[in-house]
Every structure is written in C-alpha cells, then in structure tokens.
Amino acid sequence: LECYQMSKVVTCKPEEKFCYSDVFMPFRNHVYTSGCSSYCRDGTGEKCCTTDRCNGARGG
C-alpha cells in the first residue's frame, strides 16, 4: 500500500505516517482523514496523527 505525502501533510512520527493540521482531499490525492489516533507537536502547533488510511484504501 503506497502512501502519499501532500504539502500540508506532515510526518511527526515514523510509525504514524499521516499527521496533518487540517486536510481533506476529495480529489485524486487520496488523503483520507477519518479520525485521530494521537497528536503530535510540530513547531506550528499540534497535528492530528493517524495510520488509518493510505492511498488506494477502499471504502469509508
């Protein structure tokens, strides 16, 4: 499963590849944000982190 990193997506933790401040892409970028498993700090403030979805994930 291949994961895409968009401009607003930040990886704060190696094990949690999807950290974001406010991202939802209803386009082909395939960045899905369906909840936070944790939060992390990144200079600008807190980011929501999840491992739920990667590019190509089906449903939901």
UniProtKB/Swiss-Prot annotation:
Tissues expressing the protein: Expressed by the venom gland.
Protein name: Weak toxin CM-3
InterPro entries for the chain: Snake_toxin-like_sf, Toxin_cobra-type
Main subcellular localisation: secreted
Keywords from the named record: Disulfide bond, Secreted, Toxin
Top-level taxon of the source organism: Eukaryota
Disulfide partners: 3-19, 12-36, 40-48, 49-54
Family note: Belongs to the three-finger toxin family. Short-chain subfamily. Orphan group XX sub-subfamily.
Molecular function GO labels: toxin activity
Record's subcellular location: Secreted
Pfam families found in the cross-reference section: Toxin_cobra-type
